[in-house]
């Protein structure tokens, strides 16, 4: 099992990995900036990966080649791994957990102009 430090797999779901499948992807709820700020736009997050040791080619290969979109490719795309189990409700991914002043600084530095409004980087609003 491989996971980034900010990805926490649901321990209840680890036992759901079917050993007939080579690989598993835990679909995780994503939280951004605060522990209770659910990010519905990037959830579910393709987070933690799991496989048997004999099927592990490399950690990088596991992260970059076992993707949910592979399941949509036709059977003749033998270059795409398709023996993947999707594990729903697979845990939590926490992104950019920062204090209010750091969140404000991050919003001010974003290139995206839609976030360039006082309401988004005002520290008092962030504290709410």
Enumerate the language-model features and the residues they cover:
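Charged phosphate-binding loop/patch that engages nucleotide di/tri-phosphates or the phosphate backbone
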Residues: 121-128
């Amino acid at each position: 099992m491989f996971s980034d430090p900010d990805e926490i797999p649901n321990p209840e779901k680890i036992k759901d990995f079917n050993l007939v499948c080579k690989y598993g992807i835990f679909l995780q709820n994503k939280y951004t900036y605060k522990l209770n700020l659910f990010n519905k736009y990037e959830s579910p997050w393709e987070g933690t990966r799991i496989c048997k040791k004999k099927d592990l080619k490399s950690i990088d290969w596991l992260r970059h080649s076992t993707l949910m979109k592979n399941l949509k490719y036709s059977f003749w795309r033998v270059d795409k791994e398709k023996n993947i189990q999707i594990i729903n409700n697979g845990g939590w991914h926490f992104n950019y957990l920062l204090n209010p002043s750091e969140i404000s600084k991050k919003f001010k530095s974003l290139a995206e102009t839609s976030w360039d409004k006082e309401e988004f980087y005002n520290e008092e609003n962030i504290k709410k």
